[in-house]
Amino acid sequence: MMRTHYCGALNRNNIGQDVTLSGWVHRRRDLGGLIFIDMRDRDGIVQVCFDPKYQDALTAAAGLRNEFCIQIKGEVIARPENQINKNMATGEVEVLAKELRIYNASDVLPLDFNQNNTEEQRLKYRYLDLRRPEMAQRLKTRAKITSFVRRFMDDNGFLDIETPMLTKATPEGARDYLVPSRVHKGKFYALPQSPQLFKQLLMMSGFDRYYQIVKCFRDEDLRADRQPEFTQIDVETSFLTAPEVREIMERMVHDLWLDTIGVDLGKFPVMTWQEAMRRFGSDKPDLRNPLEMVDVADIVKDVEFKVFNEPANNPNGRVAVIRVPNGAEITRKQIDEYTQFVGIYGAKGLAWAKVNDINAGLEGVQSPIAKFLNEEVWKALAERVNAQTGDILFFGADKWQTTTDAMGALRLKLGCDLGLTRLDEWQPLWVIDFPMFERDEEGNLAAMHHPFTSPKDFSPEQLEADPTSAVANAYDMVINGYEVGGGSVRIFDPKMQQTVFRILGIDEEQQREKFGFLLDALKFGTPPHAGLAFGLDRLTMLLTGTENIRDVIAFPKTTAAACLMTEAPSFVNPQALEELAISVVKAE
């Protein structure tokens, strides 16, 4: 037998037992007559002692080095009282080695487990990076999460049904990864960005509660929390309203947090998209941050200051204030840095006012814009934002979107810089009632979620007449500023679906070409249905306390969508391309 116990599982209850362990040398210490090693496996670390009492094992241990793969047979004994290590789960015991077997020696590692290695090194030698206890723990947590989700879904009547990986390219927002067909030359499959249409078709097939833990693919620009291939917990239901879907999914996430890290998330508040954008400048607000935006356009619309009065009198403008309690200590240099920061989001500047004495009116205000205000305006501003002595007010004034984006980003930065964001808290919420459509860079209407989301209380005729007023029956789950899941009630009326396609500029010929199968299916007694998808990678990232999604994926890609370990993507044999009727055009 190669193993009777895992290293990290040993404790006082095992004292006196003979055990067989298999794993790696984590650290070695030679004390002359005795040799100690920390032995590691996926479950943890235990100290092993080589004693002259078992001379053969001691002699063999002299040749051990870090990362040798070994087997130990020995007895679990109690550590002397003065050698107990309370920082180790196994710190009360050690294993007295009777036999040592070396499965494999190890070359000197290209990584140093005791130092910070570069991201490039870690990804190139990922199989070594995953030996680190913190990395192993993250993947164990991920496995625990998926196991919990499957149990929850099974207990609530959901069926685990697989959907195709090779499918048809359909416009879902990002670029598709295309797969050429050898049999149908000149034609391509697409790897799914999500199982969206297939799970809707499953509802039409009568499977009223579906789920799947599934790989999805998007060829898009990457960030720290994005990967070209990622894993979704995909869910769809029939005959449930949006609040009913949210209740089930909230219960799952609530219980997942309790099961995984012992945290009770409580009841999730519900907030409309409009409120989230107005107060926090984001559709995924981090409620751990106490700072909020307050609209003041009505107060400053008549001041002799074009920076304020022009957006204040523009229906598409916005003037908003963030009050920072006790922020008057912020230096001019810091203010200049914040001014540069909001410029990233298109803001032309950042007005500010320090409240040195709230009872002194404008005399108690230190600000380059004080000369444009009068006592009445200042009093109204101070009351609106509840200004106090020692505060600083930051003003954003521009187009609605620019002000909202810039001040929302500033809010987050101020919360971090000033230690206002309560990092030890969990703050979940639902964001609902998103706009049905938004304008793209060319000014055309685009679906804010996807083109299969149903509007709220709109007929097809009303939607076509006034699409920009429509509210989507959509919902996102947000935790600590991260969107962890999003979904909607789906369109189940063929007339409504065709109307949405037309609004998005998809004519009837394109509708038949791209979505003919869906439009046909909608004609045959389609049930009302709604669903949601969670990002498993992002959930795991939050539950393990890391800020990089690559830390919770066994073999992730870089931000350039490359695998440094296998050197994918790579060139392929010209003969393979010829069989696919593909010729590669070299970039100039």
Curated annotation (Swiss-Prot):
Principal location class: cytoplasm
The organism's place on the tree of life at top rank: Bacteria
Region (Aspartate): 196-199
Example GO biological process: aspartyl-tRNA aminoacylation
Residues that bind ATP: R218, D219, E220, Q227, E483, G535, L536, D537, R538
The protein's Enzyme Commission number: 6.1.1.12
Top-level enzyme category: ligase
Binding site for L-aspartate: E172, R218, H449, R490
InterPro entries reported in the protein's UniProt record: Aa-tRNA-synt_II, aa-tRNA-synth_II, aa-tRNA-synth_II/BPL/LPL, Asp-tRNA-ligase_1, Asp-tRNA-ligase_1_N, Asp/Asn-tRNA-synth_IIb, AspRS_core, GAD-like_sf
GO molecular function, one term: aspartate-tRNA ligase activity
Cellular localisation: Cytoplasm
Assigned GO CC terms: cytoplasm
Reaction equation(s) it catalyzes: tRNA(Asp) + L-aspartate + ATP = L-aspartyl-tRNA(Asp) + AMP + diphosphate
Annotated keywords: Aminoacyl-tRNA synthetase, ATP-binding, Cytoplasm, Ligase, Nucleotide-binding, Protein biosynthesis
PROSITE patterns reported for this sequence: AA_TRNA_LIGASE_II (PS50862)
CDD domains: AspRS_core (cd00777), EcAspRS_like_N (cd04317)
PANTHER family: ASPARTATE--TRNA LIGASE, MITOCHONDRIAL (PTHR22594:SF5), ASPARTYL/LYSYL-TRNA SYNTHETASE (PTHR22594)
Family: Belongs to the class-II aminoacyl-tRNA synthetase family. Type 1 subfamily.
Quaternary organization: Homodimer.
Function noted in UniProt: Catalyzes the attachment of L-aspartate to tRNA(Asp) in a two-step reaction: L-aspartate is first activated by ATP to form Asp-AMP and then transferred to the acceptor end of tRNA(Asp).
Protein name: Aspartate--tRNA ligase
